[in-house]
A protein has these predicted regions:
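Ferredoxin-type iron-sulfur electron-transfer modules in oxidoreductases and energy-metabolism complexes
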Residues: 95-99, 132-144, 148
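N-terminal [4Fe-4S]-dependent radical SAM core
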Residues: 65-108
Length: 186
């Protein structure tokens, strides 16, 4: 049988991929959106012609432990231009079920990425800078389409530094005005 290619990303992989290098073939350093198309195309080519995983190291933001290439962290500069899920899975279990997700029956909407603070102890500040925001217009359109597709009554605002979002009050008013419940998780 053929071994699958194992890909990892996220805060821990971005901060220090080496401890998992024996188990992971490819690490995405930073955010996947800017390189997702290129990575998927390379995976398709890789499946057709078996090669060494080092070919992935030529993609910005991809770390392959066997490669000696320096890795540049990739990040989305304009959140308005990047995709956001507008049809989210909602558990079909009782609210008291241990299988209910932490956010429950809600539409999770990301307003910000990164953080404007410079806390020395915070991993997120160092790997996910600079802070970026979605425009109010974009957030509203995500909510409209997401609520239509997801069939829930609650919107959760997601962001590492959500209270620094310049349109927080406006988006909260928008959600409440349209009769939805509002959640701002810590």
């Amino acid at each position: 049988t053929e071994d699958p290619i194992v890909i990892a990303g996220g805060p821990c992989a971005t901060a220090n991929p080496e401890p998992l290098a024996d188990f992971i073939d490819i690490f995405v350093i930073g955010e996947a959106e800017p390189i997702l198309d290129e990575l998927v195309n390379q995976l398709i080519d890789y499946k057709k012609v078996k090669r060494n995983t080092e070919v992935f190291a030529d993609i910005d933001g991809v770390y392959v432990s066997q490669s000696l290439n320096a890795v540049k962290r990739v990040w989305t500069q304009n959140l308005d231009e990047t995709m956001h899920p507008v049809a989210q899975q909602v558990p079909i279990v009782d609210d008291s079920s241990p299988f209910m997700t932490i956010f429950g029956r809600t539409l999770a909407v990301e307003e910000t990425r990164g953080c404007s603070r410079s806390c020395r102890f915070c991993l997120l500040r160092h790997i996910n800078f600079p802070m970026r925001e979605r425009s109010l217009k974009k957030v509203e359109s995500i909510i409209v389409e997401g609520m239509r597709n997801t069939h829930v009554s609650k919107v959760s605002l997601i962001g590492a530094s959500i209270f620094d979002y310049s349109h927080l009050e406006d988006v909260c008013e928008y959600i409440v005005f349209h009769g939805y419940e509002l959640s701002i998780p810590s």
